[in-house]
Amino acid sequence: MKRAMPFIISGMMKLTIGIATCLLLLFCLVLLQQSSNIFNHHKSVFTKELDEDSCLSRYPSSLYRKTSPYKPSQHLISKLRRYEMLHKRCGPGTEAYKSATEKLGHNHVSNSGDECRYVLCVSPLSGLGLGNRMISMVSMFLYALLTERIMLVDQRIDTSDLFCEPFPGTSWFLPLDSPLMDQLDSFNREYSRCYGTMLKNHCINSTTIPSQLYLYLFHDYGDHDQMFFCEDKQMIIGKVPWLVAKSNQYFVPSLWLIPSFLTKLIKLFPQKDTVFHHLSRYIFHPTNQVWGMVTRSYIAYLSRTDERLGIQGSLKSMYWEHPTLTGAVVVVHQPSQEAHQQSDKKLHNKKTLAEMYLLSMTDEVVISASSTFGYVAQGMGGLKSWILYEPVNHTVPDPPCGRAISMEPCFHVPPVYGCKGKTGTNTGNIVPFVRHREDRILGIKLVQDTS
């Protein structure tokens, strides 16, 4: 009997292995079919030229979320394909890029209209959270799409550790040997080529076009910096070959208030509150290391749950100290295990990005007021979050939370200029699809116009 047992176990093991193998093969076939369906659904958003192995998150990420009800327009799809061709023609390493770089040595340029033009997205080397970086990069990319520019990004920080290259056959990183590289830290509001400063000093007009222009679009920008959002000023800015931009804002809503952009935007985004949803999913794909963090956490903690609630906040100790009223089991998972954002630490930023992605994979999400971290998660997930309002004079608001009016991020500090000489313009009352946000009277955001 003792000798028979191993054979029985062995037979059971073989049967178990056989069943497991069949299930695994079936799962792989389903996964391949789903991946095929994903590509067919997004075939115009994600080109076949992109290498799947070098960026494992690009296609399978949709498997971890519910199917998005928001479909990209054909105009957006075509625009992205044309942009990819333009980036491939004008990107780093090309003759066109070399020719454009040579212009940086000139004070002024004459623009024939057929040269490549660029917008360089620069982030401070410290002090700027990942959420702010991501919402400003989406804003810059939309601006690049609207103005036929190539968007490049600063590679001195950890962008390459966080995100895959989004465009096929080329790079979006400013080369380290670029003449601009040594100047990046000197770009500030006092810089001689700062747009606001030049405008204030009457040093820029339609006949004197500088080879480069610095755009200061941070929350504390001045009145002259804010003139960037004026139609007539865009006509001049559009002729400058190189724009270097620093921002911590999601300034997309104000682009909709520029008449020449509005006609293009309506075609690209018929559903106006899907800008961040579509563009963030297009340009942001976690590197394999970050994607590994996401998938491991998802499989271990989220894959077998009936309903997933994402909360952007520190709640773990709450459920240790206070049971639920109904006795229901609440399990809180936080990959980074860090209560405060540490924007200068590369590993922390990887964990932060992983958490953003995990939040975007939930069924419902609750975020704190003014949280760019939360904005990224809700936008990528296509979710209208519940927003926890900030206390006023140490008093909890009534109600304490409310539903977001759209899944778009908020432009916290929109311009209050008047492009036609008016001051104190209320940018939340100009068009019905740009409104004041739910919990910040000065901020504005895009909504789907139902009027």
Stretch-by-stretch model annotation:
Residues 7, 322-362:
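Donor nucleotide-activated moiety binding/catalytic core segment of transferases
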Residues 4-21:
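N-terminal Sec-pathway targeting helices
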Residues 18-316, 326:
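Secretory-pathway glycan-assembly enzymes, especially type II membrane glycosyltransferases
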Residues 314-339, 382-385, 393-395:
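Active/binding-pocket-proximal capping segment
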Residues 145-157, 368-369, 380-410:
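Gly/Pro- and small hydrophobic-enriched strand-loop and loop-to-helix capping segments
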Residues 138, 352-395:
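A donor-sugar binding/catalytic signature common to diverse glycosyltransferases
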Residues 392-451:
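Leloir-type glycosyltransferase catalytic cores
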